[in-house]
């Protein structure tokens, strides 16, 4: 499950690094644009509400949030963005799901295929690895603001599956169908969220050796550096020696 693996912890650290590079600003704005296609009022659009909360958590400027909403609703140009997911394999036979948001799917699929090939991976057919993952909701909260007991009381009552300790933060994990109910229950309780999003959680993880792990991390880095890539999900776990090296 999300947050229960060393790979997930590396992703958290990488997320903070990405934020410094501005990559997360682009990602957050695209998520708002896509969410706003279903309506520009966050009160009646739970996905938009979550997208705005995630954008605020990384300090995306208010004007950029407002412009992204207008692009999604068609008030401004630039909202012609499609959501897609590509499936494939990395070194060691690791399963990969690459989620993208693009205004040119032909360009993006070519770039993703090239990155995979360059780093010892390959593109697969739609559905080739998706069955190895479960769609979950993951809500992240600051560790020093809440106790586990406080979160358990609200989150589990609302239908969350688990509350996990991720070192510097808490993670509330939900089934996809219960995500909005849990997030809204936390909001109603006055809980401030660092992020609230869906993720693909591997049903089983492949343990890789350090050499394969390094190859996989280079592949993931290359994919995430692509402007159209929103998220990369994989079913591998890193060996302790590589975790220490990356940490």
From Swiss-Prot:
Compartment(s) of residence: Cytoplasm
Gene Ontology, cellular component aspect: cytosol
Keyword Nucleotide-binding part of the UniProt annotation: no
GO terms of molecular function: DNA binding
Disulphide bridges, residue numbers: none
GO terms for biological process, alphabetical: regulation of DNA-templated transcription
Family as reported in the entry's similarity comment: Belongs to the TACO1 family.
PANTHER family in the cross-refs: TRANSCRIPTIONAL REGULATORY PROTEIN YEBC-RELATED, TRANSLATIONAL ACTIVATOR OF CYTOCHROME C OXIDASE 1
Protein name: Probable transcriptional regulatory protein DVU_2259
Source organism of the structure: Nitratidesulfovibrio vulgaris (strain ATCC 29579 / DSM 644 / CCUG 34227 / NCIMB 8303 / VKM B-1760 / Hildenborough) (Desulfovibrio vulgaris)
